[in-house]
Amino acid sequence: MPKSVKKINLRKGKRRLPKGVIHIQASFNNTIVTVTDIRGQVVSWSSAGACGFKGTKKSTPFAAQTAAENAIRILIDQGMKQAEVMISGPGPGRDTALRAIRRSGIILSFVRDVTPMPHNGCRPPRKRRV
């Protein structure tokens, strides 16, 4: 199960943030949640791997939910009330991470999907035969 939450030291000490941007990057192997201020400087981050999940458990929706809760816990202490959410990637944890953010009580001004879509670029990986 996940490790106990370790405190990520803030670069500029305890600062008040009324508004910020939450970036969710959901790949097939891991989910990374990064919280920045409006200028783009990272305030806190968390990932399924940093929460103590290993191997295939990192790619589960529950691991993404835990990562989102850990990243947001620091924000609520700093007084963040409003945030924008940018979701990127096709992974299984994208919806669960968003649901965890909604439950935290932060008002979401908008949710934007910024997944890069190719206009017929690189060839995708082959389908797995199990």
UniProtKB/Swiss-Prot annotation:
GO biological process, alphabetically ordered: translation
One Gene Ontology molecular-function label: structural constituent of ribosome
SUPFAM superfamilies named among the record's database cross-references: Translational machinery components (SSF53137)
One GO cellular component, as annotated: chloroplast
Segments crossing the lipid bilayer: none
Pfam families associated with the record: Ribosomal_S11 (PF00411)
UniProt xrefs under Gene3D superfamilies: Ribosomal protein S11
Localization (cell): Plastid, Chloroplast
InterPro entries assigned to the protein according to its UniProt record, in alphabetical order: Ribosomal_uS11, Ribosomal_uS11_bac-type, Ribosomal_uS11_CS, Ribosomal_uS11_sf
Keywords of this entry: Chloroplast, Plastid, Ribonucleoprotein, Ribosomal protein, RNA-binding, rRNA-binding
Signal peptide limits: none
Keyword NAD: no
Family of this protein: Belongs to the universal ribosomal protein uS11 family.
Record NCBIfam families: PRK05309.1, uS11_bact
PANTHER family in the cross-refs: 40S RIBOSOMAL PROTEIN S14/30S RIBOSOMAL PROTEIN S11 (PTHR11759)
Subunit structure: Part of the 30S ribosomal subunit.
Annotated HAMAP family: Ribosomal_uS11 (MF_01310)
Name under which the protein is recorded: Small ribosomal subunit protein uS11c
Gene for this chain: rps11
